[in-house]
């Protein structure tokens, strides 16, 4: 079970703060590392936290993920809940497996880390319906984007398990590391921008295309 800590304890243990500080600037390697670290924590400690003597589902969002050196760790903080990261079954008070709701929240977190905005036009799970088009993040991150889509499926039974997410993340984290050793696959002048506001709009549902300044 994940233990709750105060903000002061968080900053003492993890002086670099939380992942929220670089939401929108997360590259593919860091995204896979975040998935590996958070899923490992959930599998080791469970999807629960003890608050005031009561067991509750742990919150997952960029503000609840501490930067731990070159990696990340999931923490539980008071007043850290953000309903944009609540899976639709949580919003609708439907009975569901906590693990599958955690998978959804983790995918919504990764989407925000990479794109700099929340899914469903910023409204998260409360706006998702069975007929909602699943968001696609980046054309240059097809494997990561597909995994996020699978994890955000409205149908709980169609989402992968934490074990499946971890296995995919480990494989692709290693792939990214090897690609970094081999050098960039695209010339700098032809590489796609990493800015969320310059993402290929064709990959977005219409309501999620970011405004151009």
Residue ranges and their predicted role:
Residues 89-100:
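Conserved end of the kinase activation segment
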Residues 177-213:
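Regulatory extensions appended to serine/threonine kinase catalytic cores
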Residues 14-37:
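Activation segment of protein kinase catalytic domains, centered on the conserved DFG
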Residues 139-152:
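Conserved C-terminal C-lobe helix
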Residues 154-160, 164-179:
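Terminal C-lobe "cap" of eukaryotic-type protein kinase domains
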Residues 42-68:
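Catalytic-loop of the protein kinase fold
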Residues 113-117:
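Hydrophobic anchor on a C-lobe helix of Hanks-type protein kinase catalytic domains
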């Amino acid at each position: 079970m994940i233990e709750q800590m105060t903000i002061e304890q968080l900053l003492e243990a993890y002086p670099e703060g939380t992942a929220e500080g670089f939401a929108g600037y997360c590259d593919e390697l860091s995204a896979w590392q975040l998935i590996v670290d958070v899923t490992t924590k959930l599998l080791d400690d469970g999807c629960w936290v003890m608050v005031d003597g009561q067991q509750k589902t742990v919150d997952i969002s960029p503000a609840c993920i501490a930067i731990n050196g070159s990696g990340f760790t999931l923490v539980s903080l008071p007043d850290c809940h953000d309903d944009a990261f609540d899976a639709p079954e949580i919003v609708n008070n439907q009975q569901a497996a906590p693990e599958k709701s955690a998978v959804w929240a983790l995918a919504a977190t990764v989407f925000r880390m990479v794109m700099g905005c929340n899914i469903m036009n910023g409204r998260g799970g409360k706006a998702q319906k069975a007929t909602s088009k699943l968001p696609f993040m980046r054309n240059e991150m097809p494997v990561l984007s597909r995994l996020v889509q699978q994890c955000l499926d409205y149908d709980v039974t169609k989402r992968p398990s934490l074990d499946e997410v971890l296995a995919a993340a480990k494989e692709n984290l290693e792939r990214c590391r090897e690609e970094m050793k081999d050098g960039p696959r695209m010339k700098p002048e032809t590489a796609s921008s990493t800015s969320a506001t310059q993402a290929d709009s064709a990959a977005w549902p219409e309501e999620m295309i970011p405004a151009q300044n």
